[in-house]
């Protein structure tokens, strides 16, 4: 079987599909019509794998951005609810993603720091890479945090 050949639902049992995506989440692109259960497992491992899923449900979209806010960039048509709970903010040096679900604390994705709490973000601003004194963008980050 060619590596890029689609694997039909009849050819591969659900357990085998689960094992394939467990090994490598991007293998979902070779599974024809993966179930929502499989889609959820994949995006919970790696939010970026949503790029391999055609027409993901709102729940799959939500799980992808909960895993990594940057995943919003890989959703072709995010639902209106998804658009309403994530802000994409461009700063002088990078993009910041803020996930603000109702009744939950906002979560920030900044660079490789995925879905960190407000307190974690503030701690990083003051303590990493020399703090406010050595990084001119830190004040910009604090200004963003104040909005949430």
What annotation goes with each model-predicted range?
Residues 1-128, 132-133, 137, 141:
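Alpha-helical scaffold segments
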Residues 142-148:
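Mixed-charge, Lys/Arg-enriched low-complexity segments
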